[in-house]
Amino acid sequence: MLFLHDVWVNWFEGEENGYNVCHFHEWRKEDSVELLDQVPLLKVQSPLYDYIENDLSELPKTLLESVFEKSYIRKNHERRKLEYCFVVTDGIRIIAVDTIGYSIPVRKSRLIPRQEQLVYEMVKDVKAEEYEFSQDSLESSKEYHILSLPPQHISGLTRKERQLKQLMFMALDQLKGLQNRAEIAYWYTEWNPRMYNQIKRMSFEEIWNMLYNETIDGWSENHLAFCEKMIKGQPFFEKLWEMENESKVN
């Protein structure tokens, strides 16, 4: 088995989408970075890698058994064992995983560039491990939705833009749940004032579909202003907004 040593990790907990596991250039000063003293390195086939990075489902039992208590974390000058922690790659992409004792990839992290390069060199001529895992298990039941957007609608955005876009869609999801035509018409007019007259005869569903389809792609100053208006007066959303706008990228 291959091992990495002195690996810096920045855990993102409960993330089912790989796009929310930030690469090193998006790590922040307030992130809690840890040092893994030793961690197993696994090379797997791309379908299994996708399943690990972009889901929170059960990991293959044989994979978990192969890494059991082979990782150590160094904290406050102490070296402590981790039950199921490993770095996995398909030879192209790389992610670190810690199940915190469960059988699903609860915590995920990218590596720093120097250690990513080391991974590529170590696995270059290594055959991908075959785990007892049926292809059917790879067919995850996961579906993208308004609170878990498809990657194509997040691709290319910065960490801050991703977080604010997800906040905006949390507010939109709440708006959709109200099923109030006057409310949706008001907010669509805020987004696209030029359509004020055209939407007068439209149903809630028609206006909602237009608003969703026009806001789903990209991120702009218009998105930012719209998001700020939508979350105003809602303490939970305002707190998330403030946290994101106070953060500075390293």
Swiss-Prot record:
Source domain of life: Bacteria
A Pfam family hit: DUF3603
Entry-linked InterPro entries: UPF0736
Family classification: Belongs to the UPF0736 family.
HAMAP family: UPF0736 (MF_01860)
Name this polypeptide is given: UPF0736 protein BPUM_1067
